[in-house]
Curated annotation (Swiss-Prot):
Gene for this chain: MT-CYB
Note, other: Heme 1 (or BL or b562) is low-potential and absorbs at about 562 nm, and heme 2 (or BH or b566) is high-potential and absorbs at about 566 nm.
Function: Component of the ubiquinol-cytochrome c reductase complex (complex III or cytochrome b-c1 complex) that is part of the mitochondrial respiratory chain. The b-c1 complex mediates electron transfer from ubiquinol to cytochrome c. Contributes to the generation of a proton gradient across the mitochondrial membrane that is then used for ATP synthesis.
Protein name from the UniProt record: Cytochrome b
Keywords, in A-Z order: Electron transport, Heme, Iron, Membrane, Metal-binding, Mitochondrion, Mitochondrion inner membrane, Respiratory chain, Transmembrane, Transmembrane helix, Transport, Ubiquinone
């Protein structure tokens, strides 16, 4: 069997990726989230496939088909809630994975990092089009508001908007194409994940110390397969607690009302994992400015490798930048909270301050902290 796994063209590929892969001996549990994201992706594709068998993308029947899945299909309620809450778990793992990358300086693996940003954007797009599919109140109005942002693009905005809608509002054509996008995007994500891993295995994993670990590598199996398995069990436990005890805690009550184009919900807001970006979008009074800030809030991640001038890898031995990092995380949580609040004082002001702070920490404060820390190093 050993010879088989090392010689067979297909098994050799799997062997070099998951079995005989040389991994640093000191990577912590923060490195578990990559494999957890893989598990989340598999759960989403499998549950999504079964949901697609019973879902209809017509505006007149979409809401009823989701109700039919929950009421009449064997374990349909379970599949539906696994899919909905699985998306939340996906984004929790994604945020931690990116946060770990920033903390430990993994962004210096340029290709892996950039593919990761593309993956992040693709996952956000998938989640957005998926949220529209039940054709309920918040789905409909969320789709209307977010797609409407395209009209802020000069000259071609309105034409582009009507082209994406397939009409003059979110209607049957929109729902059908969003279903098509939602079906194909996870497979594109899977392909991108393979490219992500390909680039990662070219350089090898980063590790908490930030030092070169080539002199101290251990095989991925059995050490990290067992470690990842523990993470997977914990993830599934949290997911099942969510699904079986609090299935609607992360959803919106408005989504249990069929879409009504004549009645606008009091507070239109996206799913919780988009709230930080939504808060940044809302904090700028100008429409085009808001859209640019929204896009930049994610694309700013691509600037990390170029803004980093530190002589040390990662933030483990850099207290000033470490302090800024945790302020940044706290600020992100504040933005998430603000995104779910109505547009009124004091929420708007807090949102504007947090949005400014979000970009200032990354573009100004962290590079300055890098320089200060480099000077402190030079003094010793």
């Amino acid at each position: 069997m050993t010879i088989m796994r090392k010689k067979h063209p297909l098994l050799k590929l799997i062997n070099h990726s998951f079995i005989d892969l040389p991994a640093p001996s000191n990577i912590s549990s923060w490195w578990n989230f990559g494999s957890l994201l893989g598990v989340c992706l598999m759960i989403q594709i499998m549950t999504g496939l079964f949901l697609a068998m019973h879902y209809t993308s017509d505006t007149t029947t979409a809401f009823s088909s989701v109700a039919h899945i929950c009421r009449d299909v064997n374990y349909g309620w379970l599949i539906r809630y696994l899919h909905a809450n699985g998306a939340s778990m996906f984004f929790i793992c994604l945020f931690i994975h990116v946060g770990r990358g920033i903390y430990y300086g993994s962004y210096m693996l340029l290709e892996t990092w950039n593919i990761g940003i593309i993956l992040f954007l693709t996952t956000m797009a998938t989640a957005f089009v998926g949220y529209v599919l039940p054709x309920x109140q918040m789905s409909f109005w969320g789709a209307t508001v977010i797609t409407n942002l395209l009209s802020a693009i000069p000259y071609i905005g309105n034409t582009l908007l009507e082209w994406i809608w397939g009409g003059f509002s979110v209607d049957k054509a929109t729902l059908t194409r969003f279903f098509a996008f939602h079906f194909i995007l996870p497979f594109i994500i899977t392909a991108l994940v393979l490219v992500h891993l390909l680039f990662l295995h070219e350089t090898g994993s980063n590790n908490p110390s930030g030092l070169n670990s080539n002199s101290d590598k251990i095989p991925f199996h059995p050490y990290y397969t067992i470690k990842d398995l523990l993470g997977v069990l914990l993830l599934l436990m949290v997911l099942m607690i969510l699904v079986l005890f609090f299935p609607d805690i992360l959803g919106d009550p408005d989504n249990y009302t069929p879409a009504n184009p004549l009645n606008t919900p009091a507070h239109i807001k996206p799913e919780w994992y988009f709230l930080f970006a939504y808060a940044i979008l809302r904090s700028i009074p100008n429409k085009l400015g808001g859209v640019l800030a929204l896009i930049l809030s994610i694309l700013i991640l691509a600037a990390f490798p170029f803004l980093n001038s530190s002589k040390q890898h990662g933030l483990v031995y850099r207290p000033i930048t470490q302090f800024l990092y945790w302020i940044f995380i706290a600020n992100l949580l504040i933005l998430t909270w603000i995104g779910g609040q109505p547009v009124e004082y004091p929420f708007t002001t807090i949102g504007q301050i947090s949005s400014i702070l979000y970009f200032t920490i990354i573009v100004v404060l962290m590079p300055v902290a890098n320089m200060i820390e480099n000077n402190i190093l030079x003094l010793h």
